């Protein structure tokens, strides 16, 4: 419907909030959209890359659970850590769950890589 068209137009113009809404729309088949996980991930990535913690959290959770996407604990840890740093309170519990099931060396490697990325971006 009309709301879907407006959100998609705003998302295409680069609004992170609209990109997150469009991602959610496809993830849960809202506003008359057909459920499309690949499309949801595409829009979540656009919003997450702009630093939106809710999109980073959504991506991390999807990757952690492997629902509609290949489960990837390393990528999930990266997105959830970014979401946490950017203010997502909910990310912490999911990070704790990942820490329990991941190899400590893998977690250290991810944290080192994220620190390097932050230094090169800063």
Question: Where do the language-model regions lie?
Answer:
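Short helix-capping/linker turns of helical repeat alpha-solenoids
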Residues: 7, 12-16, 28-30, 49-52, ...
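Terminal, low-structured helical/coil segments at or just beyond the last alpha-helical repeat
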Residues: 86-122
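Alpha-helical, heptad-rich or low-complexity scaffold/stalk segments
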Residues: 61, 75, 82, 97-99, ...
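TPR/TPR-like alpha-solenoid signature
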Residues: 20, 57, 77-78, 93
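Hydrophobic face of amphipathic alpha-helices that form TPR/SEL1-like repeat modules
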Residues: 6, 21-29, 33, 58-65, ...
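Structural signature of tandem alpha-helical TPR/SEL1-like repeats
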Residues: 1-6, 33-43, 70-78, 109
């Amino acid at each position: 419907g009309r709301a879907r068209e407006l959100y998609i137009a705003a998302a295409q113009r680069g609004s992170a909030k609209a990109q997150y809404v469009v991602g959610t729309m496809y993830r849960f088949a809202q506003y008359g959209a057909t459920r499309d996980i690949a499309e949801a991930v595409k829009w979540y990535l656009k919003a997450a890359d702009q630093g939106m913690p809710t999109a980073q959290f959504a991506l991390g959770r999807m990757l952690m659970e492997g629902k509609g996407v290949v489960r990837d604990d390393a990528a999930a840890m990266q997105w959830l850590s970014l979401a946490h740093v950017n203010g997502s309170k909910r990310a912490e519990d999911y990070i704790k769950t990942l820490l329990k099931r991941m190899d400590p060396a893998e977690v250290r490697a991810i944290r080192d890589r994220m620190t390097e990325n932050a230094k090169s971006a800063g």
